[in-house]
């Protein structure tokens, strides 16, 4: 069995719903202004659950649907830019929560591209290490790194987690991936980490520990990145756009997806969107959307879909897979 397939999908969203009207109570904005510029109406916000907590809840659902016991997991990868702490990794915390004692564990920091990067990373390790199964999680508690006085960013982000269990299978699964980055544009989207203030530093450097984003630069990059990644992941596969049931994009902003669809000369109906209710949950957007599609009965065995994402780094990626 040389193919790697998604065997189970799961997601978890905090219960607190924060509407645009609620945000307008503490920054100068309105529901109309936010919807017009982003397509978003509400997002979920954690009231205390950390990244490992929501990751574990999404993972348990994915494992249940895959019919795999956590004790049999051989690999756990968590994609996040909002970990509980620097060390241990969120993946190690999830391993402990699940009692998945056999699993190798690590986090990847690829921002909004993280889940797509994680799938291909897990596939490669499963092939090279002969693992039978793996867990890939995209999870964020972005509310703790959001500047709630910055109207340009606080309207965008939400909290949530999505998880996929991968297993070896005779049937096709992950067909091809395309991973890229442009580090020269990295300053367009940043979150500071720690202050540089030691007895040996020449000057004190204070980190801005909240999201700082150049929205215009990200929009230009994102439209081009989606076009390139989707086009490249289709090359040499004998798969046409007519064969693709859905493209599942990172849910960053409706305008980005609209412009990308136009550039690809595809109908917007080909793109699955749920940002209106969930907002931008960074590495979690793609698996949360996949989980929603699964629960709505939109994904059938043999369906071909493309996952495409872009984000901090700057990074971008796409995966062509068969459900």
From Swiss-Prot:
Its EC number is 2.3.1.180. One of its GO terms (cellular component) is cytoplasm. Gene3D superfamilies: 3.40.47.10. Keywords: Acyltransferase, Cytoplasm, Fatty acid biosynthesis, Fatty acid metabolism, Lipid biosynthesis, Lipid metabolism, Multifunctional enzyme, Transferase. Residues 251-255 are annotated as: ACP-binding. Pathway: Lipid metabolism; fatty acid biosynthesis. One of its GO terms (molecular function) is beta-ketoacyl-acyl-carrier-protein synthase III activity. It catalyses: malonyl-[ACP] + acetyl-CoA + H(+) = 3-oxobutanoyl-[ACP] + CO2 + CoA. It is an enzyme of class 2 (transferase). It holds the Pfam family ACP_syn_III. Catalyzes the condensation reaction of fatty acid synthesis by the addition to an acyl acceptor of two carbons from malonyl-ACP. Catalyzes the first condensation reaction which initiates fatty acid synthesis and may therefore play a role in governing the total rate of fatty acid production. Possesses both acetoacetyl-ACP synthase and acetyl transacylase activities. Its substrate specificity determines the biosynthesis of branched-chain and/or straight-chain of fatty acids. This is Beta-ketoacyl-[acyl-carrier-protein] synthase III. It comes from Clostridium beijerinckii (strain ATCC 51743 / NCIMB 8052) (Clostridium acetobutylicum).
């Amino acid at each position: 069995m040389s193919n790697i397939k998604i065997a189970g999908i799961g997601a978890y969203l905090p219960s607190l719903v924060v509407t645009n009207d609620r945000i307008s109570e503490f920054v100068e904005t309105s529901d109309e202004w936010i919807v017009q510029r982003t397509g978003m109406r509400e997002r979920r916000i954690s009231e205390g659950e950390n990244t490992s907590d929501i990751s574990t809840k999404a993972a348990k659902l994915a494992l249940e649907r895959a019919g795999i016991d956590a004790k049999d997991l051989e690999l756990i990868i968590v994609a996040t830019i909002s970990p509980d702490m620097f060390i241990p990794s969120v993946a190690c915390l999830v391993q402990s929560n699940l009692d998945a004692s056999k699993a190798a564990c690590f986090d990847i920091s690829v921002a909004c591209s993280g889940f797509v990067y994680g799938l291909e990373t897990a596939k490669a390790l499963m092939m090279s290490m002969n693992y039978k199964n793996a867990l890939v999680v995209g999870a964020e508690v972005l509310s703790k790194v959001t500047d709630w006085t910055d109207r340009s960013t606080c309207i965008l982000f939400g909290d949530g987690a999505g998880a996929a269990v991968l297993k070896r299978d005779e049937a096709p699964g992950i067909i091809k991936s395309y991973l890229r980055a442009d580090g020269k544009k990295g300053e367009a989207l940043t979150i500071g980490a720690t202050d540089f203030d030691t007895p040996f530093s020449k000057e004190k450097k204070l980190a801005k520990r909240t999201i700082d984003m150049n929205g215009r630069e990200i929009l230009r990059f994102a439209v081009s990145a989606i076009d390139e990644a989707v086009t490249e992941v289709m090359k040499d596969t004998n798969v046409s756009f007519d064969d693709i049931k859905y493209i599942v994009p990172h849910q960053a902003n409706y305008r980005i997806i609209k412009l990308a669809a136009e550039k690809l000369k595809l109908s917007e109906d080909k793109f699955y969107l749920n940002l209106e209710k969930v907002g931008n949950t960074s590495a979690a957007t793609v698996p949360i959307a996949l989980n929603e599609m699964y629960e709505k009965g939109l994904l059938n065995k043999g369906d071909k879909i493309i996952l495409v994402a872009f984000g901090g780094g700057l990074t971008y990626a796409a995966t062509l897979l068969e459900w």
